[in-house]
UniProtKB/Swiss-Prot annotation:
Belongs to the universal ribosomal protein uS19 family. One of its GO terms (molecular function) is rRNA binding. Protein S19 forms a complex with S13 that binds strongly to the 16S ribosomal RNA. This is Small ribosomal subunit protein uS19. The gene is rpsS. It comes from Latilactobacillus sakei subsp. sakei (strain 23K) (Lactobacillus sakei subsp. sakei).
Length: 93
């Protein structure tokens, strides 16, 4: 279910403050955040944001195709190791 249009998009205030601080400085650094729920705004384009996946911060470079999506969509929280492999020796018995 999508967010109500009357409410508008959401982004954490501390993340917006970090983006604004980076805009003032010449050097762009990776911005660490735990806010997977924040919507990507057009002002985020060109920045690298390290989003927490529950174990580590994964860097995500923001491009114009990502605007309107949530940060958490680009960093999966679960790692898939594949299904169990069939053992040829046990199958032959």
């Amino acid at each position: 279910m999508s967010r109500s249009l009357k409410k508008g998009p959401f982004a954490d205030a501390h993340l917006l403050n970090k983006i604004e601080a980076q805009a003032d400085s010449e050097k762009k650094q990776v911005i660490k955040t735990w806010s997977r729920r924040s919507t990507i705004f057009p002002s985020f384009i060109g920045y690298t944001i390290a989003v927490y996946d529950g174990r580590k911060h994964v860097p995500v470079f923001i491009s114009d195709d990502m605007v309107g999506h949530k940060l958490g969509e680009f960093v999966p929280t679960r790692t898939f190791h594949g299904h169990g492999n069939d053992d040829k020796k046990t199958k032959a018995r």
